[in-house]
Amino acid sequence: AGKHRQPSGNKSTHNPTYADPVIGTVSHIGDRGDGYVVVDAHGEEIRCHVPRTLPGEVVEFAVETSNSEARIANAKLIRVIEPSPERVQAACRHFEFCGGCQLQHAAPTAIAEFKTERVRRALIQQDLPTDVLAPAITAWGDNDPAQHGRRRMEFAIQHHGQDIKLGLHQPGSNRLIDIAECPVAASAIEDALPDLRELAALALKAGEQADCHVTATNNGLDIVLTRKREPGLDERLDLPEFLERKGWPRLSWRSSHRAPPETVTAFTTPTITIAGHQAPMPAAGFIQATSAGQDALIDAVMRIVTATGENAYCHDLFCGLGTFTLPLLAQDRNRKVSACDMAGDSLTALRQAAVDYGSRLMVEPRDLFRNPFYADELKGTDCVIFDPPRAGAEAQAEALADSTVQTVIAVSCNPVTFARDARLLIEGGYHMTSVQPVDQFQWSVETELVAAFTR
């Protein structure tokens, strides 16, 4: 499922003022990763978001005064008076300011519990059963250095004459935090931070800014620059030499995050590995954040599909590069899979990766938000898997609710939209038999999950 960081230049300047410090106890962690503390203000309760705090901690903090009538307020942490036993030392020097991570102060057990509870809250909000919810699986890849770290990142870059800034924005602000390290990123990306600054010096003029999308692939870093100005002749002459020197396979440019990337220079096609298959990587294409997370999601999906029996005919909706299509085809030599997505470049890559499967794979470009698969199109289908972006798959869930498909598997990166879609399936006669959270976003509030529904 896709995650999109707000592009640089679209953030507002926020210079809050604060009331006098108060002391309170953190009740729980909210969906943003902030601790919740309730304070009394002239007889009214105000719920305060206090960053970098944990449940049970006694903390001193100051509440923003920008909206004195609000019953929910942001706050800044002053000090932790009584720390939680789950509190740990942050791994990164930039944690207090950078917008990339929210939970570096929490032990892995506390993060897993938070992500499980985040899914539980979403289910409760839709009056859905929680007895089928399993504890979150942590899939950061710590036990395998080759799997550790996020293999896709997007940094903001700014050229200030002699000074190049590269990093992430402070939460709710247009202030760019210039980073010297990023332990959440794959080592191939973190080690290349000086090289990315060198790229910025070549690609940007003084006063310019851009976003730099970086994907760690099997054969080097795949780079996409997002900026308004099209690359000039000098850049098109200089950048290939730079890329060749760094051993990076491709550099692309786009004018906005919605525009298709244009290749500036490419020495080879970047690839990623999915269940043993080498899949060509579209520029700025979507892949799961970590290879360990990808494997955990595949394992969860394949266990459910296996229970449907041999030769099951499957639809893989929002299939992308084939995260589930490829292992589905590999697992059962008699299985047929219909794969669908609106991203044509991803479908092209999937066809290339699955060339050995011949007619067992059917690929269809389709906008599933406007044109979902309806019940009559799903006759004879044994299993449907859908893995939509954060917005969820409301239209497709409504259509599935009217179908006779025996098994539906929902993969989601947003517990709230998942719970909404799950309610539609249950109202249509499905039983939710399992919900498995998967934590592949180390130190972030983002939560993946895999859920099974049967008739």
Task: Give the predicted meaning of each segment.
Residues 136-145, 211-213, 256-260, 436-440:
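Short, solvent-exposed loop/turn elements at beta->coil junctions and helix N-caps
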Residues 78-90, 96-205, 209:
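Extended interfacial segments that mediate partner engagement and assembly in macromolecular machines
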Residues 56, 185, 290:
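Short, conserved phosphate/pyrophosphate- and ester-handling motifs at nucleotide-, phospho-/glycolipid
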Residues 27, 62-67, 156-160, 215-217, ...:
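Short beta-strand micro-motifs enriched in acidic
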Residues 1-22, 31, 202, 228-455:
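Rossmann-like S-adenosyl-L-methionine
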Residues 1-94, 173, 315:
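Terminal RNA-binding accessory module
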Residues 151, 221, 311-312:
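Nucleotide donor/acceptor-binding cores
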Residues 135, 207-217, 251:
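A short glycine-rich, hydrophobically flanked beta-strand micro-motif that places a catalytic Asp/Glu
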